[in-house]
Structures are given as C-alpha cells and as structure tokens.
Amino acid sequence: MKANRIWCFFAWRMVVRASFLKEMDSIFVSAIRQNVQHTHSALLAKLKEPPDPDDENSWLCRISKKYDACGSREYSDKGLKGTYCPEDFCCSKTACFYGSCGSWCHDNWALCSSSIIYHDEYSYGKCNCKRFQENCDVNAICVHANREDGGAYCQCKEGYWGDGKSCKIDFCQLQPCGAGTCTRTDEGYKCDCPETHKLIVVEDKETCKAKPDFCAEEPCGPPSMVENCVNTDDSYECVCKQGYEVRNGRCEEIDLCADKPCGPDEGVHECVTERQPKLRYRCTCKAGFDLTTLPDGVSQKCLKNFCYEEPCGTRDLVESCKSKAYGYSCLCAAGAMVQVINGKEKCIKADLCRNDPCGPETAVIQCYSHGTSYRCLCKAGYTEVFVNGKSSCQKGDPCTLNMCGGNEAVQECTTDGTAYGCTCKPGYSIAIKHGQKFCNPEEECASHCGSAAAVKSCEILDSGGYQCTCNPGYVMRYSDYVKGCVEGNQCSLNPCGEQEAVQRCIPEGDTYDCECNPGFVKRVLPDGNFICADPASCVGNPCGSSDAVDACIAGTSTYTCRCKDGYTPQSIGSKLQCLPESTDQTDFDSKHKPEDNKGRYSKGTIALVVVGCVALLGIIAGGISYARNRGGERDDEDLAPPPRSTRERRLSSMGEGFENASWASSVSMIPSAPAPPPSGGIWS
C-alpha cells in the first residue's frame, strides 16, 4: 500500500511536471508570436509612414515629444513661461507643462495646475489635415505624419516644388537639360552641361545639346603628324607633333627653308629641314659662298666670299684676302702694295725703286725689282752692298768693303773689280746671302746642310731658313736624325715609292727617274720628283693643279676629278685632268708633247726681255736638262715639264750667268754685278 502511494506520488509529479512544461512552452511561443507580430506591425507602419518634408516650413502642426518646443511659446529660466515639456504628457506641439499645477494655455503664459495643459487650438487630436490643409498651396496636398510624434504638413503635387505652402512649377521634372544636370531656381531652372555637350537657349529655354565630333574623321591629318585633336563648340583644334605646324586646319610639315634662311638662291646649293633629333635646317653653299654661323650661335647662312675670285691679285703679290659682309680687304705680300682701282682694292707690285734706294745717279746704273725686294746695278768703282736687308751701291771694290766678312773670319779676299773670291780661316766656310758670299761660322751651315765635304753651297734665306746644294755623291735628306747632305744618290732615299710598285730607281745627277712595275703608273709630285703610284689613287695630283681641281677622289679601279668653275674633266690619253672648258684636245697634246723621242726638253733657253727701250739678255737655264724619261718611253702621266730642280730654283737673275765660278775648297769667285752685254744694254 505504501509502495502504491509512492508510485502514485511520482506519477502525479510527472504529470504535473509535464503539464507545467506544456503550459510554459505555450506561454513562450505566444510571447514570441506576439513579439514578431508587434515587430512586423511596427515595420509595416514604418514603411507606410511618409517621410518628413525637406523643408521645416512645410509643417502645419506637430505632436511634441518631451522637451520639444511648444509652438511659439518662450522659455524663461524663472519658470514664468513654459517652452519645453519636461514630462511625457505633452500631446501636441503647443502643449505646455511646467510645474505641478496647470490651466489652459493661452497666447502668453499661464500658471500651471496638476492637470495636463493643452493648447486649445491643437489639443485633443486637432492637429490634422482636415483642420489645417487650407494653409497649403493650391498645388499641394496635406499629409498626416502617422507616427508617435506625428502631425500634419504640406507637400507639393507632382510637377511642382516648394515647401507646400508655396509651390512652383518643377521644370526639371520634364528633363529640359537632356544629358545635363537641371537645377531649380526661383525664376525657373538652369542647366549644367557635360564636356560632350554645349548649352544652348531655344525660345528662352536652356538645354544641353551634344557637340559634334569634328575629330572623328581625322581632320588634322595622319597620326604620324598629329599629337591630339580637340573638339570645340563649333570646330576643332589641332595639336601637332614636333616638326609639324598647323596650316589651313591641318598639321603640315614645318618647312624651315621656306623663308630662305640660308640666304639668296644665288649662293645656296641646298637647304634641308631636319626634324630629328631636333627641328633645325642645314645649308650647303655654292662655290664662292661660305657657310657662316650668325651671331646668335645657331643660325647659318651662305655669305658671299668676295675673296673667292682672288680680287686682290695674283698669289705672289697677296699675303691674304679677308672677305667681309659687303666686300673684302687685301693684305699684300712683301714687295707689293694696295692700290684702289674703281673703288676696289688690289695688290700691285710695289715700285721699290721709286725713292732711289740704291743711291745717287753717280753710283747707280739701275735699280730693278728682284722678287719681293729690289737689286742694284752699280757703276764702276761701286759695289752692291746689303745692310740690314737693304741693297745700295757703295764706293769701293768688294774687298775694301769687306764683302767676305771681318778679319776674324777671312783669310784672303781677291777681286778683279767685277767679281771677288773669299778664302776663309779655319772654322769658317763660304755661305751666301742676298746673292753675295761671305765667310760664315762653319758649324752654322753644318748644323743645317751637313759637313763641308758634302755641301756645295749654303744659302741663308731672307726667311731665316737655309737652302743647301750638295756636292756630287751626296744627296739632301731630312729626317728626325739626319738633316742635310749625306753620302749617296737620289735613289738611296727610295723616292719612287713602295717596293711593290717600283721596278727600279735610276739616279741622274741631282735627280732621278723611276721605272714602275706593271699595274702602277709614274706620276709627278708637286716638287717635280717622280713616284710610282696606284692608277686609282690621287697620289701626284693626277687631276691637275689646285687652280683647276676642287677634289680628286680615289676609287677601286680609277680616280675621278671634281673640277672648279671654268674647268671640266677631260681625258688626255689614259689620264683624266681638269682642263679649261675651251681646251682643244689636239692643241693640248701638241703643247705638252716632248721635243725629242726621249722625252727631254731643250737644254738651254735664251730669254730676251725688253724693259722700257732697253733690251736685256740673259741665260736662264744654261746647261740644265729636263731629262725625265729614259729610253724613249712615253708615259701619259708625264705630259708637262716638271718644275726646276733645287739647283735651278736657287739661281737668281743676278747670278745665273756666273754659276761656273770656282767653288774649290773654301775659295769661290762671284761677280759683284753682272757685266753689261756687248750690245751696250744693261742687266735687270
């Protein structure tokens, strides 16, 4: 029995427990459902609530929360005028509560009782559209704010804008600006257009119109010239790359040469505009014009070279010619002077005898020009003497005038009245200056010409240099180690050229001849000597003299000639030369053909020169042979006679007839002046 009671107790307990749990679950689920429903209702209510108006002035009336403003009432810290609702009892915007007592609120202020205070105008649900919507604009509606602190406000109808109490037409609703931005104004609206559009006014109304794409068809030109094309309101603008400029609405090449910056066409061969690495122009000038850099250091111009045609005169008279902007000036060589002829300068041979530098008529037969200086022909009893480089006729014979030098140098001086000879003391040797010999310190000539045994003559030149003539068996050699006359002949110096080109060198007295290997030709060098050269080379100036030749250009199989104005390349046999344009081939061949079958020129030439009414006779090159081609061989490279040898060039017009004077040891005889010819004429 007792066990049954215990079992019943536990059974009952379990039933009660189950019932309690079931009831609790029911309560919990119900609470959750209520909470969800409440939340859902709140969300729906919130979604249905209209938003607050944009403008505070849109409100007609409003339910206040605590501490919110009560209409137009003012607040005083003395508590006389209530403005804020300190507790939760306010039910309208103008409901006022202050203190523990209250009464109806009036326009000003009132004492308060314990009752809730309402403003009669808005209290008890009177804040609604039914009562106040007449305060809205005719183009507005009244809207209830369905929320805890709700109220009523005005809202402009669609197509209008404002605070609801005053509504204006909303022109922006019609999107009058198109792609632009429309902004409402009191007067209407305004448009702000994007860069792709422009603002236009049509019938006093603004709108945005799309700009045409003027650049679509590449009006500025190809991309290689154009940096950018920019559309404007009514057109386009071109931005060109370096080296190009806008012309006629397109990018065109900048032609820096269009304005002829190089100068007039007469002097410009070519003007080229260069665009890389930077924009510039380049000039090449015609013959007779010089490319000149202007003072800005950048610009160039072809300026006329007024010296190109050698207006100052022949080269022997001219030291230099300086071309200027509008003319030239001449600097004449020694023995020449500037003379203005028809307003232009020219160097003419100076009349150095004009002031009778040789002396009085009692002493002088004649004063005559001699190179860039003058010489004196003296009467009997007078001798030509040089003092400080100037010649004059001094009374006395050569020996009494110490022509050989001072006693310290001269062993003996002998004279026959017209010629004199010098015997020098040891340590001195014969030297020549101004055509007159004297005893000079031996080491002076030895240091320039070589030993006394090797040197035939040592001539001191006006320039300060030395001209040496070697004895037979000696040749002149200049090198880093040897200078002067050394033992050997002309061929010992290998003058004919490289070994592969030379078959043999043939010595001929003080000169030589060359025989060349097959494939090489013999040419004449500017100094009159020969050399074996490659026929395609320019060795030996095969094109001719510098007066005619602008350039010789070597090739692989032949050479070519570029000639100066007035000359043209012409073939003479197998040789190409620059010759005057009027040169006849037959005349040229006959003028340059050797007189005998061995290629030798005449051995002696007699020159008759007439000065005023006096005939002057002189032997110019007696006994000198121009033998240059042995065995009768003809060489087309050898058409003109070479210049005179060193010995020939050394002879002056005063001494040529007396070169046979003795030069044995240190004794020599030389005339102080040439004897008058049998015809009674005089020497010049």
Curated annotation (Swiss-Prot):
Its main location: cytoplasm. The lineage of its organism: Eukaryota, Sar, Alveolata, Apicomplexa, Conoidasida. Keywords: Cytoplasmic vesicle, Disulfide bond, EGF-like domain, Glycoprotein, Membrane, Repeat, Secreted, Signal, Transmembrane, Transmembrane helix. Glycans are attached at residue 660. The chain crosses the membrane at residues 604-624. InterPro entries: ECM_structural_protein (IPR050751), EGF-like_Ca-bd_dom (IPR001881), EGF-like_CS (IPR013032), EGF-like_dom (IPR000742), EGF-type_Asp/Asn_hydroxyl_site (IPR000152). It comes from Toxoplasma gondii. Disulfide bonds join 172-182, 177-191, 215-229, 220-238, 240-251, 445-458, 449-468. It is a single-pass membrane protein. The keyword Protein biosynthesis does not apply. It comes from the Eukaryota. Disruption phenotype: Conditional knockdown results in decreased invasion competency of parasites. Decreased capability of parasites to form moving junction and secrete their rhoptries, measured as a decreased formation of evacuoles, vesicles that are formed in the host cell when parasites are treated with cytochalasin D (CD) which causes an invasion arrest. No significant effects on intracellular parasite replication. No significant effects on parasite egress from the host cells. No significant effects on parasite attachment to the host cell. No significant effects on microneme secretion. SMART domains: EGF (SM00181), EGF_CA (SM00179). The gene is MIC8. Residues 1-18 form the signal peptide. Residues 168-203, 211-252, 441-480 form the EGF-like domain. This is Micronemal protein 8. Invasion factor; required for the formation of a moving junction with the host cell. GO terms for molecular function: calcium ion binding. Probably interacts with MIC3 adhesin during the transit through the secretory pathway; however, the observed interaction is not essential for the targeting of MIC3 to the micronemes.
